[in-house]
């Protein structure tokens, strides 16, 4: 517990950073001995325990005052060798990471989701979340301006300006000074300093670090996040990146499921449910084409600020959506056995009136299944699963030979589960009562 000093942080960094190379150099020098030793299980457990404590400390140290969590730490090596940590602005992926880490309890997860909804990451018009908070970019004339005091404080820059040497800095018609526009990072600045004529050598030797500090003070390249912080489209400023929203949805599902399993209070579980279904509603499938900016059932990469969905095409988002949907429906697999759990199933999804369910069976034939009011159906490995409400949990297994089997409880045995997974046509329908 407690804070880690910059010097201690450097010591840990060096120790971890050189451990493998020290081992490798020992092997190069002495070769493998061929001898084998025994590592006690308690030693391995102790190592893992220490590692977990440091990981948890790192996560807790990244909690912000607003209840969110920092996503990225920026490292700066100070003049005395210490390592200083600073942070990028709040990011959606940081909140997804902490929720998915399994470290927070149900109440803490609610607090993160509440803070997220109240943050600059929430985009009201789409009722969803942007990757990073929107921001106003500086105008062109506001960029690359060297502060007059900083310029005057550098003997090298002052001398270059007096001599009319524009290799490092230039002066505009209004008297302002700017770094050479061809520099793309501090390495380019260093190369230009090294190539200055020899009369400047002494000034370069004494002022280089200060000049580099002035340069990075203006551009601060380590905080550059690419198109997300500079583009107006293509997942740029104010954009919702739908794959990350689906990751948030999955994280919210996971913490809600865990809260139910751990018997969290009904109030906390209810708030988690609310957040989960709000995130779900914001994703797009239930939106109008006008609001979504495209056909709502079509997959799109992102939605920039002020525009509809852009960049059509299937992304990795689909896997999170599938996991969430089967999770909502209550499909679980434990030790190879299919189980059903109605805890997260929205009661509004049950049919109000009888309906016909069309599906393709494992023999690639279209089938019709008549569903009563108060039921719902879906397929699992092309086997129809019909959910009915009831007080006595159970499963009816309909076999391919026409026989049926009644199962007490909501778990299938291993052989029946395998028959479903293998699409063997041994199981042709499951009716779940819960």
Language-model-derived ranges and their functions:
Residues 1-434:
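Acidic, mature catalytic/reactive cores of soluble proteins
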């Amino acid at each position: 517990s407690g804070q880690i000093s910059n010097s201690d942080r450097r010591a840990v960094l060096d120790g971890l950073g050189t451990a493998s190379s020290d081992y490798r150099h020992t092997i190069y020098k002495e070769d493998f001995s061929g001898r084998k030793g025994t590592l006690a299980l308690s030693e391995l457990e102790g190592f893992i325990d220490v590692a977990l404590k440091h990981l948890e400390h790192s996560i807790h140290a990244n909690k912000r005052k607003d209840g969110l969590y920092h996503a990225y730490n920026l490292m700066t090596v100070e003049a005395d060798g210490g390592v200083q940590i600073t942070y990028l602005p709040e990011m959606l992926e940081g909140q997804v990471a902490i929720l998915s880490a399994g470290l927070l309890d149900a109440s803490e997860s609610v607090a993160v989701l509440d803070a997220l909804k109240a943050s600059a990451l929430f985009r009201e018009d789409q009722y969803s979340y942007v990757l990073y908070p929107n921001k106003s970019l500086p105008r062109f004339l506001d960029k690359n301006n060297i502060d007059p005091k900083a310029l005057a404080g550098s003997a090298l820059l002052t001398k270059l300006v007096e001599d009319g040497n524009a290799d490092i800095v230039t002066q505009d018609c209004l008297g302002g000074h700017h770094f050479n526009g061809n520099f793309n990072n501090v390495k380019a600045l260093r190369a230009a300093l090294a190539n200055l004529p020899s009369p400047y050598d002494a000034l370069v030797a004494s002022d280089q670090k200060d000049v580099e500090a002035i340069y990075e003070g203006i551009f601060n390249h380590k905080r550059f996040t690419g198109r997300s912080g500079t583009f107006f489209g293509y997942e740029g400023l104010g954009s919702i990146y739908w794959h990350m929203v689906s990751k948030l949805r999955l994280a919210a599902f996971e913490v809600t499921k865990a809260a139910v399993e751990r018997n969290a209070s009904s109030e906390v579980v209810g708030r988690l449910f609310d957040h989960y279904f709000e995130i779900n509603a914001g994703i797009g499938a239930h939106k109008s084409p006008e609001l979504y900016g495209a056909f709502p059932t079509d997959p799109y990469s992102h939605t920039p600020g002020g525009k509809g969905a852009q960049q059509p095409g299937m992304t990795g988002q689909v896997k999170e959506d599938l996991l969430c949907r089967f999770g909502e429906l209550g499909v679980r697999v434990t030790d190879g056995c299919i189980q059903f759990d109605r805890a997260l199933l929205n009661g509004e999804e049950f049919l109000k009136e009888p309906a016909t369910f069309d599906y393709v069976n494992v023999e690639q034939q279209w089938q019709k299944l008549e569903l009563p009011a108060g039921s719902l159906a879906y397929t699992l490995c092309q086997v129809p699963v019909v959910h009915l409400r009831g007080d006595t949990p159970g499963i009816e297994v309909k076999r391919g030979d026409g026989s049926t089997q009644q199962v007490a409880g909501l778990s299938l045995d291993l052989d029946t589960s395998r028959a479903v997974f293998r699409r063997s046509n041994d199981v042709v329908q499951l009716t779940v009562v819960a």
